[in-house]
């Protein structure tokens, strides 16, 4: 109700794929092209796909971006600074980045095996996560999207520790994380797109691997995470406590 033009029209909701592409990538969001062994990027405001081992043509100066993981200072410090800035940014502008309703559109519900399968296929048909670089920020955006749009409580998305392929620990989620080798040309210069997820993904991973999402329909029937790494489920593994703790310790995985 009220006079015409008195209400401010909100921007139409974007799809999950676009939200994830815009996360931390700026104008350099992209995918891993497995067949070509390269990643593809999409310029903001354009549907044109560009293939490149780096984001050429964009000049960056140190200090332009608080979140840019520069080579100096030391690698460990830059990793920690990147992670902290990444999480600060996630907390500060989630609503602007994800652009979903503040409250869930449907009643909250826990993730189930059937629901995880359905959501996996739904995401795939809507453009999907296939070949998209994984990051902590995109992980959180996916959680927020499914909670606000589908009412799914965000306590389900976990993956095995690694290194190597990371299998979903929730049975029925059909997206696993696969490490890829990203071309290293230009990594020691300041002219490539240092904020591209292909460059920053490794800072989010304890093993320094660059990961991409990959759809695997067989995960609907085979609980690979539990079969391969039961110790990561702790008391739920069915193993004696001494055994699963010993396995975690041998793999260098902290436990309480």
From Swiss-Prot:
Its main location: host cell. Residues 88-96 are annotated as: Acidic. Residues 140-156 are annotated as: Mediates dimerization. A motif (PxxP) lies at residues 104-107. It is found in: Host cell membrane. It is a lipid-anchor. Keywords: AIDS, Host cell membrane, Host membrane, Host-virus interaction, Lipoprotein, Membrane, Myristate, Viral immunoevasion, Virulence. InterPro entries: HIV-1_Nef_core_sf (IPR027481), HIV_Nef (IPR001558). A lipid is attached at residue 2 (N-myristoyl glycine). One of its GO terms (molecular function) is GTP binding. GO terms for cellular component: host cell plasma membrane; membrane. Residues 36-71 are annotated as: Disordered. Homodimer. Interacts with host CD247/TCRZ; this interaction induces down-regulation of cell surface TCR/CD3 complexes. Belongs to the lentivirus primate group Nef protein family. Factor of infectivity and pathogenicity, required for optimal virus replication. Alters numerous pathways of T-lymphocyte function and down-regulates immunity surface molecules in order to evade host defense and increase viral infectivity. Alters the functionality of other immunity cells, like dendritic cells, monocytes/macrophages and NK cells. One of the earliest and most abundantly expressed viral proteins. The N-terminal domain is composed of the N-myristoyl glycine and of a cluster of positively charged amino acids. It is required for inner plasma membrane targeting of Nef and virion incorporation, and thereby for infectivity. This is Protein Nef.
